[in-house]
């Protein structure tokens, strides 16, 4: 049994940075793009709740008034914009969110001599022997995350690599957040609220009902997320 998501425009991308935030990449016409946002909210009313958002304007050419209208439209939808990137600073006003670069405000600081130290090797995988309970968040952008228990409803697991859940997956699982398109998500019982790989996602309503409660895996084929039963 297989379920394939429709090819999605890169409306929402989740990237690994100094924070975990949704990155919105608007496309023209903006009205159609906003309708996609509305459709996502209609399917999952709490999808963006409490999540900081960054607007990447590198794919569109908006005037200052156009940017202001976009920000107002998102605010009307209770979406909190943390910052803006991909645009010239001159197009922003002091009342708009700050211009960001790589997850931080664009502030030029004088460089100071630094002592060169030998970098310690970082682990490339994380093993959790306990369940991830409702309300908990696990973030490991360096590589794979393996959970021997279950992931509760309302919990969130974010990984730079693949995610392995040896129990029920009821919360959110976001793999490949650093652009690792070959990352996968595996679980013994799929009841997820959200699955995402390199920013392409499916919500609970998008997942084939025939797969729910069964072992499954998810991966990307081009820009399409595929979910199949895990034999």
UniProtKB/Swiss-Prot annotation:
SUPFAM superfamilies assigned: Cell-division inhibitor MinC, C-terminal domain
Pfam families in alphabetical order: MinC_C, MinC_N
Presence of keyword Cell division: yes
Key words of the record: Cell cycle, Cell division, Septation
Cross-referenced Gene3D superfamilies: 2.160.20.70, 3.30.70.260
Record-linked InterPro entries: CAP/MinC_C, MinC, MinC_C_sf, MinC_N, Septum_form_inhib_MinC_C
Gene Ontology BP terms: cell morphogenesis; division septum assembly; regulation of cell division; regulation of cell septum assembly
Parts of the chain that traverse the membrane: none
Family membership: Belongs to the MinC family.
NCBIfam families: minC
PANTHER family: SEPTUM SITE-DETERMINING PROTEIN MINC
Quaternary structure annotation from Swiss-Prot or TrEMBL: Interacts with MinD and FtsZ.
Function: Cell division inhibitor that blocks the formation of polar Z ring septums. Rapidly oscillates between the poles of the cell to destabilize FtsZ filaments that have formed before they mature into polar Z rings. Prevents FtsZ polymerization.
Protein name as catalogued: Probable septum site-determining protein MinC
């Amino acid at each position: 049994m297989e379920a394939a998501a429709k090819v999605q425009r890169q409306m929402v991308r989740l990237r690994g940075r100094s924070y975990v935030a949704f990155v919105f990449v608007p496309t023209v016409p903006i009205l159609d793009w906003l309708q996609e946002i509305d459709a996502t909210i209609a399917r999952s009313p709490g999808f963006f709740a409490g999540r900081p958002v960054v607007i990447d304007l590198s794919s569109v050419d908006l005037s200052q008034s156009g940017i202001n209208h976009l920000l107002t439209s998102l605010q009307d939808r209770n979406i909190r914009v943390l910052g803006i990137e991909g645009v010239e600073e001159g197009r922003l006003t002091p009342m708009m969110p700050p211009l960001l670069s790589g997850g931080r405000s664009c502030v030029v600081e004088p460089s100071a001599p630094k002592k060169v130290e030998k970098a310690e090797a970082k682990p490339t995988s994380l093993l959790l022997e306990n369940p991830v309970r409702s309300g908990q968040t696990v973030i490991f952008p360096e590589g794979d995350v393996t959970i021997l228990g279950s992931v509760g409803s309302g919990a969130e697991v974010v990984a730079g690599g693949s995610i392995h859940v040896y129990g029920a997956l009821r919360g959110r699982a976001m793999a490949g957040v650093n652009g690792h398109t070959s990352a996968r998500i595996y679980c013994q019982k799929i009841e997820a609220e959200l699955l995402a790989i390199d920013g392409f996602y499916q919500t609970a309503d998008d997942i084939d009902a025939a797969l729910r409660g069964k072992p499954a895996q998810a991966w990307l084929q081009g820009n399409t997320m595929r979910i199949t039963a895990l034999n």
